Amino acid sequence: SCGAEDGAFIYLDDILFSGNRIGSDLSLWIQQAAPAKAIVHIFVFIVHSLGEWQMMEKLKDETIRAGKKIDFHLWRSMTLENRKSYRNSSEVLWPATITADANLIAYIDQEKKFPFEFRKTGGSLKNNCFSSEEGRQLLEQEFLLAGMKIRALCKNPSNAMRPLGFSAFGLGFGSLIVTYRNCPNNCPLALWWGDPESPRASPLSKWYPLVPRKTYGRAIDFDVVW
């Protein structure tokens, strides 16, 4: 029961994107503070399917490595599809085509380890967040081109800094979920990258973000009306 010495543990978050934040927090807990046996309930609003699989595998491995028996239960109100094998039914930005932009084509061609695979149109979506296929493709193309412009502003951009959002592969994570608290870096760069308060010589000053991002290191004033 709640509050009992042998009761379940609860982890609360808003959205599970890559699963790295929850996975890192709970991995550290497993190593340093978790009892030998426990049940953990993870509550979020929305889950992305690839992140769920990666996170649960990570937690399972950490539990085995620690020699403990911990059961994890993930609760959500919605699951959005973003696995590569189900890209035709993806519920994130996943381009079906690209414009004839030389820089974009070169960027795609340089990815050798995980070559980008285009989405085929006509896939069935459980949670259709797009008004139409035409509207979706327009959004994907414009965010792609804007993201490429932003990458060009950076002298040595991180490999994970992709046009459609931070990701280890593809053209970016492609999330369109923004909450009143923050804009995740899994969203297209055009939404959050840049800082109008940076010095003019800084590349960050060259792009005004639509939804300025608050990083973990920056204090958040919850009394501010956004």
Question: Where are the predicted features?
Answer:
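A short acidic-Thr-Gly-centered motif at the start of a beta-strand
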Residues: C2-E5
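Structural motif
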Residues: A8-I10, H41
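Ser/Thr-glycine-rich phosphate-binding loops at phosphate-binding pockets of nucleotides
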Residues: L12-R21
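PRPP-dependent phosphoribosyltransferase catalytic core
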Residues: S27-W226
